[in-house]
Amino acid sequence: MRSGGQDIQVLIDAVETDDTVPGGPVVLYRLLIEDPAKRTFQNACLPDARGRQLGLPLQKETGVDFTCTSGAEGKCILMGYRPWDDRADVPMQDLHAACVHMMCADYGGDDRPATRDGTLVDIYDRFGIQKPDSVDPLPFEAAWGKNGALCVAHTRIAENVTLDGLAKAYPKLRSSLGPEVCTEEAMRHHPAALLFNRSASTAP
């Protein structure tokens, strides 16, 4: 495996199956990477919400890579959005991409995360893989497509980015910002809207 332009050795130390993933079990691996200076191996992944330090292989355009369950890609897979699952009724690759953008609050789809670890987010989709929380629902935040947000009612962390900031950075979103124009009801009819989320509204 290559990292930072260097070849590093990866050791699969353990294997376990997560049977709680929507759509069926997913095999996870405990991955160890070599520290050449110390000639020792250390865990490649940070702990996820369940304290597990696990990962799994993920096919990308550049080849096979490993992703951790603590990262956005891994979290989205464990929510049931499997990019390798070629289904006629659900665009899984696009749904996984939308989920990664949503998880990071990457509104413009250009790998500029605007979230904060530990932020409570309610995630659901138009296909019923994930369903919205019906108890004390949070305010609607945004609708998401494969290339980022399609509309934003409020930003997740106002300290990181505001609606005005999004309007300046992403002209394509200017007419789709604010709770008056960005509603779940309206976006349910948008063909490119795959994923939706709610989060607590924060003041700048």
Which residues does each predicted region cover?
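Long, compositionally biased low-complexity segments
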Residues: S3-P204
